[in-house]
Amino acid sequence: MKSNKKFIPYIILFGVTLFFCWLFAGRLGMFGSEVDWLSQHSVIPDYFRQQFYQTGELFPEFAPSLGGGQNIYNFAYYGLFSPLILPSYLLPFVKMSTYLMAVSFLTLSASVLLFYYWTGRHGFSQSIRFATALLFLLAGPMIFQSYRQIMFVNYMPFLLLALIGVDIFWEKKRFMLMTTGIFLMIMTSFYYSICGMLVVFIYGIAKFPLKQHRKIHTFFQFILPFFTAVFTSAFLLIPTACALLVRSGKSPKTQLKTLFIPDFSLEHFTYTGYGIGLSAGILAVLILGIFLFKYSEKLMCILCIIVLTLPVFSWILNGGLYIRDKAFIPFVPLLCYLTASFLQRIQTLFSRKYLPVILLTPFLIYLVCAGLYINQELGSNADKELCESLWDSSWKSEIDAALAQEKGLYRMEQDGSLKEDNSNMNRIWNPAQWTTTLYSSAYNQDYQTFLTRTFKTELPYNNAISHSTSGNPLFRKFMGVKRLINKDEKGNISTQLAEYAAPVLYATDRLISSEEYQKLSFPYNQTALMKYAVADDTTKKSTDKKAKIMDSAVPVKLTFPQDSSIHKEGDNYHIQTPKPIDTVLHTELKSDTQKQLFFLQFEVKNAKPNHSVTIKLNGTRNKLSAAYHIYHNDNTIFTFVTELEAGQEKIPVTFSDGDYTLTGIKSYTGALSLLTDTSLYQSEFIPDRTHTKGNHISGKISFSQNGYVITSIPFDKGFEVSIDGCAVIPEKVNTAFLGFPLSKGNHHLEITYHAPGAKVGKILSLLGLFLWGFSWFISQYVYQKSRCEHLSGHQPLVHLPKGSLVH
């Protein structure tokens, strides 16, 4: 009977966790958010699973379906080898979204229960253990991020296992639990595992037995699990590091001297979903703990204060990109442990059993109130009706049917409302469905540059890395988007076919040099790619290329409406309006008998930088995000390319509220033949569907002259190309894509991608497995030696406090 009672607190805590998940999130909608969860965390793991079913490869290297085709380690952050995601591979009948909601809740519950168990090992009273477990649960990021950016917190059970493993290491010199916890933490969330390992290190150093401080070999025994876990996970870490290090991006400039000035602002500790998110009392615990605690907890307080208040640690833990408190989320369990130690000390000093709980109660109430506010205002819970539409199996049926009909290699995308497109950027229904769309914090840099600087596709969202289905028909043709899947208001799904889309791989001898291409400005830098491919080795020269390109679009007069909110200032237009304006632009078409393409580009000068600017032209949306936005898109050049009906001179446009000026306005029209002309694609690649999957493309191509194979697959150094079994050096064509020379004749092509660092990572992981065996041997040796010393009359290595185990 007594043994059964010890499970009662765990059952109660499980129920309390369920209640607060419902209170903070479940009652507001799905246990998933429209921000990131719906567009990244629930769909990219599903793509991993689909590719595994297609290829049977547990160690994939390439993601052909996302962002034109990219190194799969660009997306490793989303759970490529996560121990929480891999079990879903055994459950093909369970939707990934459903699976993730269940796993997120169970992970959160396991974290709370493990925290309760961990504090029990240290002899804390049951009331203190229960109260601090609630504190841990109600910390800002715990529930909030369990349904938003789940990688912020889903490693917590393994972090707690590692902390428990530290205790076992100092008690028995056993390494396994500590090593396992660190390894699983890395595999679950390598980004947060760095800070997680710092937390484990701080806790372990503080618990280092005083009598052994001079035994260097004991310290090396302690850090051995860190090296073992890191080396074992090298098959993930090395190729991921190689993928991330080639990326370049803007980050806020940080002055070196400011990194070493302590910052004791309460916002670093108090309630937020993007930081530690505890109450202000935690700062008092850390400061008073220096005077009230014994050595180990005192050292923990000092080290925590140093790390949490010196900006240099935040900067380092955020990869040197910026200073943000989200990197400190792994400190939550350690700070809650110190809170338990503080309450226990108060209980001992004042001999009042319930005084600690009474002291903590106001802070818990505050966290509940703050949690209600932040989850309701910022949680952005996914709407059930939206999710039902996004997860409608009819999408898959339509896409599967279209793929079954396709003999060539083309792309296929979903098209819908702004919110639907945002949610579908990474959604793949069939691993043979290739797309141009992508929303990921890591990406192919050449492709990103092509989208945002070269072709200047529209940016409809707040950040510059969200690329949904483009409204630019030239871009869709260039990238081989042959089918757009739509759903009408009645829920009927249909396919819009673009017969003139470029094959993803084709051969041509119509080339223009990089030097010539770089001289072209808008819109000719777009129209040129409909007529020529850009390659440096241009063996065929032509003097009339530039003339043909310049004839592809002609300037056209554009007239803005006369409105009290729209003021003409020379060649510029100043828009100052308290509400959005729906109006039309007038243009003089050169022909009224057929459809035409309309090109428009201008610079936006925002007089109110903290207010976003959005302009929607003929259904295409461009946005300049507010300067305060954490991922400001810096989209000051708005580019629109759209189709106009025959004789259409009025173009619908919507100007958002704000105060801004449009300068450098360029407007052109081009013939529809830019879309319908396929003379550039002189020979189409015919894929072998059986072998074209995962990191491999195989098939045949015939060409009647010497030229180039041009692809719309972003270039990467990991590509290996062979023609008829002979290796060919791949080149960068069209400024950002894979290409290579081809001689005339009938050829068999093989394109294989090997992620840089993948092979080295696997070799180092084998070394890690050796270290596991070595660690086990060392732990057995040390444990037996300790036991023999104890039996022969010596004192044990470590004195355990009375009541240190769970009872």
Question: What is each model feature region?
Answer:
Residues 66, 143-153, 250-275, 302-351, ...:
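Membrane-helix boundary/interfacial segments in multi-pass membrane proteins
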Residues 74, 366-381, 404-475, 502, ...:
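Extracytoplasmic/lumenal acceptor-recognition loop(s) of multi-pass membrane glycoenzymes
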